[in-house]
Amino acid sequence: MAYPFQLGFQDATSPIMEELLHFHDHTLMIVFLISSLVLYIISLMLTTKLTHTSTMDAQEVETIWTILPAIILILIALPSLRILYMMDEINNPALTVKTMGHQWYWSYEYTDYEDLTFDSYMIPTSDLKPGEMRLLEVDNRVVLPMEMTIRMLVSSEDVLHSWAVPSLGLKTDAIPGRLNQTTLMSTRPGLYYGQCSEICGSNHSFMPIVLELVPLKYFEKWSTSMLT
């Protein structure tokens, strides 16, 4: 869960989000080193009075500043491609959930069950109970089993939306006429909040997402109660 004046990412609760945090730190270190080197060179150029007459035609320097950026780009691209593959590859999911974006709410369908569907609307501020989050609570939470691979199918009924849950490293565009997929797995139970991340109209800010990750036995009890 995010908190006021937060500078970093939310705590990772999925393997993909952990990989994204490592990649962020890896890339930030490279950017910091490059920025430090550039600032050092600029300070030298501003403070020294000496000039190197052969710098205008130095093959060695040109070779270095051609090869070195290529190596840096490779060091950034390789872990990025690995994470992209992890996010797209879904092997034998234990559960498939289809979510549809509407103006301005979400609907969910558990495709492994015969008739388990519901809509999820934001709870108005006037109806909130003590301790609940303003603009983030919904009337129907998405209950899912933890420590299991879940496939999310994301689409839209009307305009562009985006289904995003930051602490799980999820952000998938909901496009009318197209079915996108992403994988989800939580390493611990809890409530995970998200919102629509694509401006979709006047009530775009009122499309929260709440995932409730629970142990498998509690998920089975919940699904049974929803079907009866």
UniProtKB/Swiss-Prot annotation:
Binding note for cofactor: Binds a dinuclear copper A center per subunit.
Modified residues (Phosphotyrosine): 218
GO molecular function, one term: cytochrome-c oxidase activity
Residues spanning the membrane: 15-45, 60-87
Residue numbers binding Mg(2+): 198
UniProt cofactor(s): Cu cation
Enzyme class, spelled out: translocase
UniProt catalytic activity: 4 Fe(II)-[cytochrome c] + O2 + 8 H(+)(in) = 4 Fe(III)-[cytochrome c] + 2 H2O + 4 H(+)(out)
Binding site for Cu cation A1: 161, 196, 200, 207
EC id: 7.1.1.9
Keywords, alphabetical: Copper, Electron transport, Magnesium, Membrane, Metal-binding, Mitochondrion, Mitochondrion inner membrane, Phosphoprotein, Respiratory chain, Translocase, Transmembrane, Transmembrane helix, Transport
Chain sites annotated for binding Cu cation A2: 196, 198, 200, 204
Compartments, as annotated in UniProt: Mitochondrion inner membrane
Mitochondrial intermembrane side: 1-14, 88-228
InterPro entries reported for this sequence: CcO_II (IPR045187), CcO_II-like_C (IPR002429), CcO_II_C (IPR034210), Copper_CuA (IPR001505), Cupredoxin (IPR008972), Cyt_c_oxidase_su2 (IPR014222), Cyt_c_oxidase_su2_TM_dom (IPR011759), Cyt_c_oxidase_su2_TM_sf (IPR036257)
Cysteine pairings via disulfide bonds: none
GO biological process per UniProt: ATP synthesis coupled electron transport
Assembly notes: Component of the cytochrome c oxidase (complex IV, CIV), a multisubunit enzyme composed of 14 subunits. The complex is composed of a catalytic core of 3 subunits MT-CO1, MT-CO2 and MT-CO3, encoded in the mitochondrial DNA, and 11 supernumerary subunits COX4I, COX5A, COX5B, COX6A, COX6B, COX6C, COX7A, COX7B, COX7C, COX8 and NDUFA4, which are encoded in the nuclear genome.
NCBIfam families: CoxB
Purpose of the protein: Component of the cytochrome c oxidase, the last enzyme in the mitochondrial electron transport chain which drives oxidative phosphorylation. The respiratory chain contains 3 multisubunit complexes succinate dehydrogenase (complex II, CII), ubiquinol-cytochrome c oxidoreductase (cytochrome b-c1 complex, complex III, CIII) and cytochrome c oxidase (complex IV, CIV), that cooperate to transfer electrons derived from NADH and succinate to molecular oxygen, creating an electrochemical gradient over the inner membrane that drives transmembrane transport and the ATP synthase.
Family of the protein in this entry: Belongs to the cytochrome c oxidase subunit 2 family.
Protein name: Cytochrome c oxidase subunit 2
Organism taxonomic ancestry: Eukaryota, Metazoa, Chordata, Craniata, Vertebrata
